[in-house]
C-alpha cells in the first residue's frame, strides 16, 4: 500500500513539474493562479513569478467554510476572482498544481471564469 501512495505522489509531482516547465517557456507577464487542495480544504493564490510575490489569496479556511467541497470551492473561486479584478487583473495563467482538472479544481476555475477572469 505504501508503494501505491508513493507512486501517486510521484506522478502528481511529475505532472506539476511539467506544468511549471510550460509556464517558464511562455514569456508573458500574466500572474499565475495556483490551486492547492488538501483532503479538507482548498487554497488559491495569485502569484507574480517575476517579482516572486503573492498578489492575492483565498481559501476555504480564510472564508471560514467547513470544508473544501465543490460548493465551497465555487465560493473560493468567486472570492479570488473578485480580489484579482479589484487589483485590475483580468487575465491569468491557471496552475492546478499537478491535480487533475476535475471536481473541486474545475468548480473553482469555472466560478473564477464566471466572475470575470480570463484564462
Swiss-Prot record:
CDD domains: Ribosomal_L18_L5e (cd00432). It comes from the Bacteria. Keywords: Ribonucleoprotein, Ribosomal protein, RNA-binding, rRNA-binding. The keyword Ribonucleoprotein applies. The keyword Nucleus does not apply. GO terms for biological process: translation. Pfam families: Ribosomal_L18p. GO terms for molecular function: 5S rRNA binding; structural constituent of ribosome. GO terms for cellular component: cytoplasm; ribonucleoprotein complex; ribosome. HAMAP family: Ribosomal_uL18_B. Belongs to the universal ribosomal protein uL18 family. Part of the 50S ribosomal subunit; part of the 5S rRNA/L5/L18/L25 subcomplex. Contacts the 5S and 23S rRNAs. This is Large ribosomal subunit protein uL18. It comes from Malacoplasma penetrans (strain HF-2). The gene is rplR.
Amino acid at each position: 500500500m505504501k508503494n501505491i501512495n508513493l507512486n501517486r505522489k510521484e506522478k502528481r509531482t511529475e505532472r506539476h513539474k511539467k506544468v511549471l516547465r510550460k509556464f517558464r517557456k511562455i514569456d508573458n507577464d500574466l500572474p499565475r493562479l495556483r490551486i492547492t487542495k488538501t483532503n479538507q480544504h482548498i487554497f488559491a493564490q495569485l502569484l507574480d513569478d517575476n517579482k516572486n510575490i503573492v498578489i492575492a489569496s483565498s481559501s476555504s479556511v480564510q472564508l471560514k467554510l467547513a470544508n473544501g467541497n465543490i460548493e465551497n470551492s465555487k465560493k473560493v473561486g468567486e472570492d479570488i476572482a473578485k480580489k484579482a479584478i479589484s487589483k485590475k487583473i483580468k487575465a491569468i495563467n491557471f496552475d492546478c498544481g499537478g491535480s487533475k482538472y476535475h471536481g473541486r479544481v474545475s468548480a473553482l476555475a469555472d466560478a473564477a471564469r464566471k466572475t470575470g477572469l480570463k484564462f
